[in-house]
Design a protein with these regions (language model features):
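Short beta-strand edge/turn micro-motifs at domain boundaries
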Residues: 81-137
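A structural signal for short beta-strand/turn segments enriched in small hydrophobics and glycine
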Residues: 161, 188-190, 224-239, 338
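Surface-exposed, glycine-biased beta-strand/turn segments
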Residues: 113-199, 229, 284-317, 323
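SH3/SH3-like beta-barrel superfamily modules
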Residues: 76, 334-382
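Secretory targeting and sorting signals
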Residues: 1-26
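Acidic, glycine-rich catalytic/binding loops that coordinate metals and/or anionic ligands
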Residues: 146-149, 181, 247-308, 375-390
């Protein structure tokens, strides 16, 4: 069943805004500056805008969320950003997540406006539209699909994948079931995006990532709080405070990097990779060679470490471990398909092998026990060594 849907229909320039809390509201100038920024950042027209001030300091600094609302119809998607603003004289300078100025301004902001934990996380952000040749060549994930995230519910529970990748760039999946408690996929700082303080929450993580959770009921509201992986965020629900529609209680889980929505396909969440189908809401997920379709059960294995891999024998059963980086070395046991392995280092000059999706490589990974397996049969999220060369 289709779940959250949001798309756009009106012009930003003529729409109202909301500023909260009232105590911070000396700000037609601030709200106007943020609203103008929404107009340039939004990728589609909106049904309204919100400028939600979370923290301010003597009307010189402000931090909050900016939202381009969606109409309450199917297949509609709101957009939202965290922002920081600084006033010099009568002029406000506003930066959104993903702007080059965002980590700079958040670093300069007083502690009462942007906390030290927030500054540390925001320092990892880089512009979504990279200007340098290096970043332009490798935008966003840049061929590295590691997230360090778990699925957004308790480890050991199984929830249903009720909607495959969907959204503007297929950045979202829908999940339902279990005990209904939605938990942080990774440690970070917590924010509620809508002025209602309901429904849509965001956790900003390290490495430029953030995760969004929509339709929540009974969500926490402590904006700026530091959350650990697995901390409670809210319950599955049908809230549409920022627009769109929902049928049946679920969480609409989305992935972002450097302030941009990014396709969730191929990224690892809870030791599963989700892949696109021929249409939105379709697709499937893989854990090693185990495949589930829409409506299938996703067991939460927990996060995959950044120097770990998942054995994917491409349907071939247990994988033979070798005493060195090649098939010509002695066999020293096997490792099960779907097993998590810890990688000590890698060698790029082993024998060549071809794994899933035609991935061919001569790289072999040395495991923590000293044995070796081909990277062709190890999902790590990148074709490069994850723990250096041997």
């Amino acid at each position: 069943m289709r779940r959250s849907r949001f798309a756009a229909v009106a012009l930003l320039a003529a729409l109202p805004f909301v500023v909260v809390p009232a105590a911070a509201a000396a700000e037609p100038d601030l709200a106007g500056a943020v609203r103008a920024k929404i107009a340039t950042a939004a990728t589609r027209a909106a049904a309204g805008t919100e400028v939600n001030v979370m923290r301010g300091n003597d009307e010189e600094w402000a931090f909050g969320s900016a939202v381009a609302l969606a109409p309450h119809v199917e297949d509609a998607y709101p957009e939202g950003w965290l922002f920081v603003a600084n006033r010099s004289g009568t002029k406000w300078t506003v930066a959104f997540e993903g702007d080059a100025a965002f980590p700079e301004l958040t670093a300069q902001a007083p502690e009462s406006v942007v906390s030290t934990p927030e500054k540390k996380i925001f320092a990892s952000y880089r512009p979504a539209a990279a200007k340098t040749a290096d970043l332009a060549a490798k935008p966003l994930a840049g061929g590295d699909f590691r997230t360090g995230m778990r699925l957004p519910y308790a480890i050991g529970q199984s929830w249903r994948l009720t909607g495959g990748p969907h959204g503007a760039v297929r950045q979202s999946i829908d999940l339902a079931g279990g005990d209904g408690r939605v938990l942080a996929a990774r440690a970070g700082t917590f924010y509620v995006m809508c002025s209602s303080q309901r429904g849509w929450v965001r956790v900003a993580h390290d490495r430029g990532y953030s995760s969004d959770y929509y339709h929540l009921a009974g969500n926490r509201t402590d904006n700026g709080a530091t959350v650990a992986e697995g901390d409670f965020l809210g319950n599955i629900g049908v809230d549409v405070s920022c627009g769109g529609s929902a049928s049946g209680r679920h969480v609409h889980f989305s992935l972002r990097q450097n302030s941009a929505n990014i396709g969730i396909a191929s990224h690892n969440i809870g030791k599963w990779q989700v892949y696109n189908g021929s249409a939105e809401y379709q697709g499937y997920a893989l854990h090693g060679s185990q495949r589930i379709g829409i409506g299938g059960s996703m067991y939460n294995h927990g996060p995959l470490g950044l120097t770990e891999g998942i054995v994917d024998a491409n349907g071939g059963g247990p994988l033979t471990k070798r005493s060195g980086p090649g098939a010509n070395y002695d066999a020293v046991g096997t490792v099960a398909d779907g097993a998590t392995v810890s990688i000590s280092c890698s060698d790029k000059n082993g024998t060549s092998h071809t794994g899933r999706f035609g991935y061919t490589t001569t790289m072999w990974n040395r495991l923590a026990d000293g044995s070796w397996i081909s990277d062709a049969f190890t999902w790590t999220g990148t074709a490069e060594p994850v723990n250096g060369l041997c």
